Amino acid sequence: MIKWAIIFAIIGLIAGALGFGGMAGAAMGIAKFLFWAGIIIAIVLFVLGMTIAKKVT
């Protein structure tokens, strides 16, 4: 998911540099959402992994 966030951020930066303000804003919004969604999923999986690892061992 972080990979897609970086791709959308690059698209947003290029679109902004070329003057496509609306498209740049939308791409950056998608990039921001994907970045935070990826971080939240990673944290949840880390916590679940730590709690399950304690129960298994």
Swiss-Prot record:
Keyword Cell membrane recorded: yes
Membrane topology qualifier: Multi-pass membrane protein
Keywords: Cell membrane, Membrane, Transmembrane, Transmembrane helix
Pfam families assigned: DUF1328
InterPro entries xrefs: DUF1328
GO cellular component term, pick one: plasma membrane
Domain of life: Bacteria
NCBIfam families: PRK13682.2-1
Full protein name: UPF0391 membrane protein XCC1302
Source species taxonomy: Bacteria, Pseudomonadati, Pseudomonadota, Gammaproteobacteria, Lysobacterales
